């Protein structure tokens, strides 16, 4: 959008990517909790995406020249580091991620597959909009691997039309609909890579085999189902962050 459709920038979500959200919180909230200067914290992200290296280096994601994310490596690089260090994962004990930034929900897990971001958003948006508990957590109609697909979600009597695309060629088609005033959608999810982040350029090579992407997506949905918390707004640490740091009167508006 920045390069080819700059006139549509105001239509984009104002939320940063998960990588940049984490970096900013780690070097503000977490640094304050530890009582250390942000420059003494090094944030390393492990990502499925090659473009995250560039994203982490963008000057708008830095404070006084100190980046929110210092180093971004992709999945295959991590695998090489593990092999280089002769780490045998089968021999490692299970452990939880560090808190407070290690707690996650099923909604966060499905971000990795096409349709997952908008499904996670719908789980929260439904409850915030209707003030009712979501009767069915899984939005099956948003799932699949078709390059372009659409669905209408019932928000307690209000139909919300969703468009989904993965792959840049498919994304362009939906964006051109918006540009031409022909888009029927209230919200659109776009992922650059086939299948979403599961097919990212930094992931183990799938070599265009859709069955590999299906299995990766199925694994994410299984992980989502196994979670106790499956909606983003149910995460107690996210709630605490909004209460003490992120919530403002502007956000309420």
What are these regions (language model features)?
Residues 247-252:
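Conserved small/polar residues in nucleotide/adenosyl-binding loops
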Residues 5:
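Conserved phosphotransfer cores of two-component systems
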Residues 199:
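Short, non-ligating residues that shape and space the ligands of small metal-coordination modules
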Residues 13-16, 26, 202:
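Active-site adenylate/phosphate-handling loop in enzymes that bind or generate adenylated species
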């Amino acid at each position: 959008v920045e390069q080819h459709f700059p006139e549509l920038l105001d239509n984009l979500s104002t939320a940063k990517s998960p990588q940049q959200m984490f970096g900013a919180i780690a070097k503000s909230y977490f640094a304050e909790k530890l009582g250390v200067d942000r420059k003494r914290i090094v944030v390393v992200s492990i990502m499925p995406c090659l473009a995250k290296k560039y994203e982490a280096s963008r000057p708008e994601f830095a404070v006084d020249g100190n980046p929110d994310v210092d180093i971004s490596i992709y999945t295959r690089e991590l695998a090489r580091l593990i092999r280089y260090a002769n780490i045998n994962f089968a021999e490692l004990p299970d452990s939880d991620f560090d808190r407070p930034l290690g707690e996650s929900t099923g909604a966060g897990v499905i971000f990795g597959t096409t349709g997952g971001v908008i499904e996670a958003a719908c789980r929260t948006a439904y409850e915030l909009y209707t003030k009712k508990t979501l009767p069915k957590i899984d939005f099956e109609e948003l799932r699949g691997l078709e390059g372009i697909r659409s669905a209408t979600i019932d928000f307690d009597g209000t139909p919300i039309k969703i468009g989904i695309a993965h792959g840049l060629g498919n994304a362009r088609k939906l964006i051109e609909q918006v540009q031409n005033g022909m888009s029927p959608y209230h919200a659109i999810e776009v992922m650059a890579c086939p299948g979403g982040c599961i097919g990212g350029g930094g992931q183990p090579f799938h070599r265009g085999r859709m069955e590999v992407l299906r299995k990766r997506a199925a694994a994410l949905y299984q992980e989502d189902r196994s979670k106790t918390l499956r909606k983003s707004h149910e995460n107690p640490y996210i709630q605490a962050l909004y209460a003490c740091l992120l919530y403002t009167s502007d956000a309420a508006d």
